[in-house]
Amino acid sequence: MGSMIEFARNGQRLGGYAAKPEGAGPFPAVIVIQEWWGLNEHIKNVAERYAREGYVALAPDLYRGKVTADPNEAGKLMGALNREEAVKDLLGAIQHLRAMKEVRGDRIGVTGFCMGGSYALLLPCRTKEIRAAAPYYGEIPDEAALRNLACPILYVYGDADFWITKDEVKRLEASLKKLGQAGEVKIYPGAPHAFFNDTRKDVYRQTEAQDAWRRTLDFFAKHLKA
């Protein structure tokens, strides 16, 4: 169902994993942003799951082919990733999707996990071309950035997360309310960071992950399929 592709962004070539539903479309689309491990089989599988639900899914390869299962190496890769260049990669992914005949160009969403969750929340603060965003346990921008949030969000979080604090999530909720931004924060008691990743038995929580998936599908259906 899916395969590696290349697409252009600002004159550069960037790789990514694309998965499409069966049929001619046009379909809504979802950008799937990797964890700090890189574009691994788990992220490719998530893209394929979205395709089975009727979305064209594109997971950009932000690390340019580098993938690891070692936390120390993952930290180095994430630390070496230039945030503004990564945003340009994601903006390029949007333009690639908008140019595809199989895609409804005004129905593009974004999701991401861990590091990817950070970018999935930042991206709709940088462009109005994202219709809905579902960041999972990502870093939260400051209020000045959130002021530019251009779409509804569903922020998914487990309150046993060692990376993102409960206070940060409360700050997000308060900022959304203060700014009048459309958003929901779903908190899973006792769920750790990366609880959605079913390839990591140390942190995967099946019940919470399945519920988060259902909620995310409902959220995207409301904003991307309507």
Put a short name on every predicted segment:
Residues 177-226:
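C-terminal catalytic histidine-bearing segment of alpha/beta-hydrolase fold enzymes
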